[in-house]
């Protein structure tokens, strides 16, 4: 059996993965502004399978509060329209030929606060994921030190580096959350 080795780059990569996942999740939150990522969670019944919206149409933002969905296949327009109506985004599609226009309504104060709570939940999940990666790294260091593969000083030095990387990624999560919260609360 191969002896496990400590790889700080792998820990950084896994922590960055948690941050990237948060950014993706926050991108799909409605803010009152039009964004093509708003439609990312919507799956369209196409050709006998559920497909992401981006695989059946081009999504653009002609105005700050308007999304334009240009469906590639004329026969798919009704399926795309149905998927948008049935999503929990509360959007009302207006169809003009192969183009579906989606007006993004302004959010009221209560809805904004609900979105901020969801954003905080996503951020906390990202923090927990980063901390799990830290724990995995620290556990591996302790095991390597216990097995005699590294010295106690090396274990301490590497543990300090893991903590520093953790702090950087937690700070990035907090900055990302603050920016999204500001965007959501902007009227």
UniProtKB/Swiss-Prot annotation:
GO terms for cellular component: cytosol. GO terms for molecular function: ribosomal large subunit binding. It is found in: Cytoplasm. The keyword Protein biosynthesis applies. Transmembrane segments: none annotated. Disulfide bonds: none annotated. Keywords: Cytoplasm, Protein biosynthesis. GO terms for biological process: cytoplasmic translational termination. Belongs to the RRF family. Responsible for the release of ribosomes from messenger RNA at the termination of protein biosynthesis. May increase the efficiency of translation by recycling ribosomes from one round of translation to another. PANTHER family: MITOCHONDRIAL RIBOSOME RECYCLING FACTOR PSEUDO 1, RIBOSOME RECYCLING FACTOR. This is Ribosome-recycling factor. The lineage of its organism: Bacteria, Pseudomonadati, Pseudomonadota, Alphaproteobacteria, Hyphomicrobiales. The gene is frr.
